[in-house]
Regions:
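Acidic, glycine-rich flexible loop/linker segments
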Residues: 2-150
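Conserved alpha/beta-domain cores
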Residues: 113-430
Length: 430
C-alpha cells in the first residue's frame, strides 16, 4: 500500500490486495481490483484480487455472498469512486479501509491469523469460552469452515441447495446434499435451517408468488403451507431424519415471530425427527426477540438473525441501496436492544447464538461479548480473524466497552468510544 492512501473506505473483509482497476463484474482475474456495485455481484465471473464496492448494502444477501469468497474488500461511496478510473493501479487494505494508487509497489502480505484446529476451544484473554460457528451454503463452505477452526456449523442455508436443472428437490436430493455437507463438516456438529426464501434467493423451481420473500411479506415458516414448498419441507425433514442416526444435527425454524408459530412448526418437525435432534427458533423480528424468554421455554435454542432484525429495528430493507445508511451497526440503540435481550434471557443466554454480518463489522464483536453473548455464527473466512480478536481481548475490557456504548447517544459517539475513524465509515444519515 502507498504511504498516503487517496481514499478511506469502510473495512469489510480483511487482507491486502493490489491490481488494475476493473469496472465490470465479468472476466475478473487475480490481476484485478473489481470496482462494482452490489447489483453486479450476481454477475461476477472469475475472482479478482480485491473488491471495491460502491454504494454498498453491507447486510444484503448479495454482500453475504461476497463475504463467502474471503477476498479483501473495502466499501466506498459513489463520490469516492469518481476518483478511480478503469485500468488504474490500485492497492486496498480490507482491515483499515485504505485505498491507494502506486504502480510500482505490490500489496504487502497482510498478517496471517493464527491457524486453529476444527472445534478447538477458543477463550478470551482472561479465559472466557466463546464459540465461533460458521454460516454456510454448500459442502465446500462447510469444509472451509472446519479448516478455519470453526466450533461447528451454526447455520446451513438450505435454500441454496437446489438441483442444477431447476427441478423441485426431493428427499433423495436432500439426502445426498445434506450428507455431503455433513461429511465435509465432520467432526463438527451442524445446524440446518429449513428452507428460508427471500426476494433475491428464490429457486428456479418456485412459481411466482406475490410478496414472496419481501421484508414484510411471505418468508420463513409463513410459506410452509404453500405448494410446492410444503412438500419440499417434508422432504428436507425426511432426509435429516435418516442422517441423524450417524451425524450430529440440529434443526432451525426460520422467521418465527410468535410462540404459537414456534409450537406449531416445532410439533410438525418433532413428529418427523428423532428425539436426538434439537429444534431451535430463528428470531429475526422485534416481536420475536422481545419474547425471547417464552421462545426459550419451548425451543431447545434460539438463533437471532441480526441482518433481518436490524432491518426491522431501522425499518429499512437491507437489500435496498437507497436505504443502506439507515442500517447502522454502530447505533447505540441497537446495542441497548441486545442488552435488553440478554437481560431477559438471563442464565439461558448460553442457548442463544447471534447470526449474520453484525459481529463481523469492525469493532462490534467485543461489544457483543461485553453484553454477554458467547455464540456467533459467521461467514467461514472471518473465523480466523475473529478468533484472534477474541483471544487478544479480556472480558472485563469488553464489558466496559459495552457499558460505554450503551450510554452513548449517537453513532459518532460510538465510533469515538471504539476508536474508529468516522472517515472510514458511511455517514449513516447522509
Amino acid at each position: 500500500m502507498p504511504s498516503e492512501p487517496i481514499l478511506h473506505g469502510m473495512p469489510y473483509f480483511p487482507g491486502r490486495a493490489a491490481g488494475r482497476l476493473h469496472t465490470r463484474p465479468d472476466s475478473l482475474t487475480g490481476q484485478h481490483i473489481a470496482l462494482i456495485t452490489p447489483g453486479d455481484i450476481r454477475h461476477i465471473t472469475g475472482l479478482p484480487a480485491g473488491f471495491l464496492i460502491v454504494e454498498p448494502t453491507p447486510f444484503s444477501h448479495a454482500m453475504i455472498t461476497l463475504l463467502g469468497l474471503g477476498i479483501p474488500t473495502v466499501l466506498i461511496e459513489a463520490g469516492q469512486a469518481q476518483a478511480l478510473q478503469t485500468g488504474m493501479p490500485v492497492g486496498i487494505d480490507g482491515m483499515t479501509g485504505e485505498i491507494g494508487i502506486n504502480a510500482g509497489i505490490p500489496a504487502r502480505h497482510a498478517p496471517s491469523p493464527q491457524q486453529r484446529r476444527p472445534g478447538a476451544r477458543l477463550n478470551t484473554a482472561d479465559g472466557t469460552r466463546v464459540r465461533l460457528l460458521a454460516s454456510v451454503r454448500s459442502a465446500a463452505a462447510a469444509g472451509q469452515a472446519a479448516a478455519a477452526g470453526a466450533s461447528g456449523i451454526g447455520l446451513v442455508r438450505s435454500e441454496f441447495l437446489s438441483p442444477q436443472d431447476g427441478t423441485i428437490p426431493d428427499a433423495d436430493f436432500y439426502r445426498r446434499s445434506f450428507r455431503d455437507l455433513l461429511d465435509a463438516a465432520a467432526p463438527l456438529p451442524v445446524t440446518v435451517r429449513l428452507l428460508d426464501l427471500a426476494a433475491d434467493k428464490l429457486p428456479a423451481w418456485l412459481p411466482p408468488t406475490p410478496r414472496l420473500g419481501e421484508p414484510l411479506g411471505l418468508q420463513g415458516v409463513r410459506l410452509y403451507h404453500a405448494h410446492p414448498i410444503q412438500q419440499v419441507i417434508q422432504d428436507q425433514l425426511t432426509a435429516l431424519a435418516e442422517l441423524a442416526d450417524t451425524h450430529a444435527i440440529r434443526l432451525l425454524l426460520p422467521f418465527i415471530v410468535r410462540l404459537e408459530e414456534l409450537q406449531c412448526w416445532q410439533a410438525m418437525a418433532r413428529r418427523r425427527l428423532p428425539d436426538s435432534v434439537r429444534i431451535g427458533a430463528m428470531a429475526e423480528t422485534l416481536a420475536a426477540v422481545l419474547d425471547i424468554p417464552h421462545l426459550l421455554d419451548s425451543a431447545d435454542f434460539v438463533a437471532i438473525g441480526c441482518n433481518d432484525l436490524m432491518q426491522a429495528v431501522f425499518s429499512a430493507d437491507r437489500d435496498e441501496p437507497v436505504l443502506r445508511h439507515y442500517l447502522d451497526p454502530y447505533a447505540p440503540v441497537l446495542f441497548r436492544l441486545f442488552r435488553q435481550i440478554a437481560a431477559s434471557a438471563g442464565e439461558r443466554l448460553e442457548r442463544i447464538q447471534l447470526c449474520g454480518v453484525l459481529a463481523q463489522i469492525q469493532g462490534v464483536l467485543p461489544v457483543l461479548l461485553g453484553l454477554g453473548y458467547r455464540n456467533f455464527s459467521v461467514d467461514a473466512p472471518f473465523i480466523p480473524y475473529l478468533a484472534d480478536t477474541i483471544a487478544g481481548i479480556s472480558l472485563s475490557d469488553c464489558e466496559a466497552l459495552a457499558a460505554d456504548i450503551c450510554t452513548a447517544r449517537t453513532t459518532q459517539q460510538s465510533l469515538e468510544i471504539l476508536q474508529l475513524d468516522s472517515q472510514r465509515h458511511p455517514p449513516y444519515l447522509a
